[in-house]
């Protein structure tokens, strides 16, 4: 792990680093004189309060074309100046995430001191990028009633479906998936400020993190014709954080509801059948406060936000020992601080720290499915040490050459614990007829993951041409530790003892991976047509580190040797997109493309080879003293089936990474 981290860091230092993951916003166009002739050498300056440096500039090339890239979302004014011509100032240009606005102007002959200010409709169509994208701006995020998270908002995108629809924020505590155009639910990619933040565990599509809506300036959803910067197909979710500014500003958002804001369809027939308490909302609320501004004007900005939100739902026909209906209470708190420093004229640094904590009081266990869990037999989810840390540097070396670099980390501690109210000596008991767990949860899960991302690229930009080359490297591990009370689970049928599971806990698994992507993405405009060719190379290596686990009731302490490079994938994915400005006025574009995409994957692929995995014996249980507590002499060991040694799976040495077109 340390070696792979060092290698990735060294690569980042050697390359002239970064435009990290997706297309940047920009402004482009052509400058002409009244006769229609193109004008080279025109100085074009884009200015906006959202830029800590104030403005960015370039000059038109010999064909009169210009392009200014790496602009943050916001409102811009663009000024065009050339000796012998009146200057032109175009105002009200609105840029969203990964959007290139086309602004063509005509300069009139006159004195430079004379100026013309034009305020008109901002370009609405990106005629250069072939990517299909929908953007939820801050205004939309504030006005549309949703659960205030990227998944609930993503349901509004045309063509996007979700595994768990959210109504009124009742489902925001668990992360669903998004699909588009028949994509897999494992192909979502989550990014913050253009950096992929998913950890290596499970199928590779999990973050284990819950996002603060107040942090977001915009959320971009890219759904087709994705460029070479994108690691996979499917839905790419890019959350653009807010920066501070030269003016102090703050907002407060508050919403809430309870049982009085919903109808009740529980009728006498259902109650007569024994269903006397339905699932319903107990309470729901969301409080989100933001504040930001200058520490030093035009040099150092800060932005901070705190969010506390909760969704508490009553569980149908589930009651505690006092007869009260049990509730699944879920609470999340998140605090974020962002600093933006314009260190020198050509060097900008952004530092981002986001800390989140989640608690869920009544969650079903992750091992054995039951229709109903007694409150003491569910698990208590506590996620206390989750944070996102990022340092990002960018430098426009010249008007045509842009470099950036970023280092990103995201520790995840995702724990599903025994209920504090459960008796320390309780044994998990499952009634197979009633499908009910009693006593305590059958398993406690301690989940730990670490992920480090390093990204770098360099962009060369002219009026008609934008060439970008870069890399993205992710390395990390995912680990789970399993514990079972007494290392045993009892099975009954309508209260009659049947069998027991003798479990090899403490057990679990740990897997690691290193995923490196190298890409080249080009964009070239020929008249009204822009082509976007690219190619991406990916190397993905998965291993099982050396690991140890202590002794349990039925098994001794164990140590397992490292298994290196079980999966070693090397893939090449060509990408090609095209965009046609149909009428040449920047209002209508026809887009298309053909591309190869790897499927998103996680280190769970090699988990079946981990000898530390959970396993168990199933044995008959004869409860001689009728105390519903299995003693050793009541377990018929001679008739046990299964094994305390995990049944190892098989990973084909020639396994190829799945892909799609």
Give each language-model segment a name.
Residues 185, 216, 242-244, 284, ...:
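Outer-membrane beta-barrel channels and translocator barrels
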Residues 249, 279-360, 381-410, 574:
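Transmembrane beta-barrel wall of Gram-negative outer-membrane proteins
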Residues 120, 252-258, 304-308, 351-355, ...:
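Transmembrane beta-barrel strands of outer-membrane/channel proteins
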Residues 85-245, 262, 269-280, 284-293, ...:
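Periplasmic N-terminal accessory/gating domains of Gram-negative outer-membrane beta-barrel systems
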Residues 176, 207, 233-235, 285-289, ...:
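Hydrophobic, lipid-facing positions within transmembrane beta-strands of outer-membrane proteins
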Residues 2-137, 156:
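Periplasm-facing N-terminal accessory domains of Gram-negative outer-membrane beta-barrel systems
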Residues 163, 546-573, 577-661:
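Solvent-exposed loop/turn elements at secondary-structure boundaries
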């Amino acid at each position: 792990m340390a070696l792979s981290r060092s290698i990735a860091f060294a690569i980042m230092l050697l390359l002239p680093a970064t435009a990290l993951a997706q297309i940047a916003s920009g402004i482009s166009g052509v400058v002409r004189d009244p006769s229609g002739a193109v004008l080279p050498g025109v100085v074009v300056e884009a200015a906006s309060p959202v830029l800590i440096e104030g403005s960015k500039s370039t000059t038109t090339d010999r064909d009169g074309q210009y392009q200014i890239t790496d602009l943050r979302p916001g409102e811009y004014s663009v000024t065009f100046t050339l000796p012998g011509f009146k200057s032109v100032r175009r105002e009200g240009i609105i840029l969203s995430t990964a959007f290139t606005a086309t602004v063509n102007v005509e300069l009139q002959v006159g004195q430079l001191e004379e100026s013309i200010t034009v305020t008109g409709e901002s370009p609405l169509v990106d005629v250069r990028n072939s990517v299909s994208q929908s953007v939820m701006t801050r205004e939309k995020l504030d006005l549309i009633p949703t659960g205030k998270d990227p998944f609930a908002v993503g349901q509004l995108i045309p063509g996007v479906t979700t595994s768990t629809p959210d109504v009124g924020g009742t489902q925001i505590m668990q992360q669903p998936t998004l699909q588009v155009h028949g994509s897999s639910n494992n192909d979502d990619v989550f990014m913050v400020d253009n950096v992929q933040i998913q950890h290596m565990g499970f199928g590779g599509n999990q973050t284990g993190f819950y996002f603060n809506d107040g942090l977001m300036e915009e959320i971009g959803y890219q759904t087709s014709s994705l460029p070479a910067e994108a690691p996979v197909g499917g839905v790419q979710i890019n959350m653009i954080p807010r920066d501070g500014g030269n003016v102090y500003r703050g907002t407060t958002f508050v919403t809430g509801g309870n049982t009085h804001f919903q109808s009740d369809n529980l009728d006498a027939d259902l109650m007569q059948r024994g269903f006397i308490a339905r699932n319903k909302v107990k309470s729901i609320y969301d409080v989100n406060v933001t504040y930001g501004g200058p520490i030093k004007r035009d040099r150092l900005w800060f932005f901070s936000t705190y969010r506390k939100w909760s969704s508490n739902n009553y569980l149908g026909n589930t009651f505690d020992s006092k007869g009260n209906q049990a509730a699944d209470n879920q609470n999340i708190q998140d605090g974020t601080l962002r600093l933006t420093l314009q260190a020198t004229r050509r060097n900008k640094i952004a530092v981002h720290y986001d800390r989140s904590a989640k608690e869920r009081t009544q969650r079903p266990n992750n091992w054995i499915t039951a229709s109903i869990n007694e409150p003491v037999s569910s698990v208590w989810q506590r996620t206390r040490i989750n944070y996102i840390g990022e340092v990002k540097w960018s430098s426009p070396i010249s008007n045509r050459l842009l470099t950036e670099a970023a280092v990103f980390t995201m520790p995840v501690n995702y724990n599903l614990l025994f209920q504090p109210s459960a008796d320390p000596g309780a044994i998990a008991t499952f009634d197979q007829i009633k499908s009910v767990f009693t006593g305590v949860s059958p398993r406690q899960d301690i989940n730990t993951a670490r992920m480090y991302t390093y990204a770098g690229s360099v962009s060369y930009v002219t009026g008609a041409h934008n060439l970008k080359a870069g890399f993205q490297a992710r390395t990390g591990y995912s680990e789970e530790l399993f514990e079972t009370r007494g290392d045993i689970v009892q099975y009954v049928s309508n209260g009659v003892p049947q069998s027991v599971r003798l479990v090899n806990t403490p057990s679990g698994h740990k897997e690691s991976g290193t995923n490196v992507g190298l890409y080249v993405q080009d964009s070239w405009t020929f008249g009204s047509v822009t082509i976007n060719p690219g190619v991406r190379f990916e190397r993905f290596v998965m291993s099982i580190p050396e690991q140890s686990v202590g002794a349990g009731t039925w098994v001794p302490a164990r140590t397992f040797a490292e298994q290196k490079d079980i999966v070693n994938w090397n893939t090449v994915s060509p990408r090609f997109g095209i965009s046609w400005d149909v009428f040449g006025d920047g209002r209508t574009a026809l887009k298309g493309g053909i591309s190869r995409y790897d499927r998103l994957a996680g280190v769970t692929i090699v988990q079946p080879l981990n000898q530390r995995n959970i396993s168990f014996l199933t044995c008959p249980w004869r409860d001689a003293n009728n105390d519903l507590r299995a003693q050793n002499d009541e377990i018929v060991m001679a008739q046990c089936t299964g094994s305390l040694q995990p049944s190892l799976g098989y990973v084909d040495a020639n396994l190829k990474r799945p892909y799609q077109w």
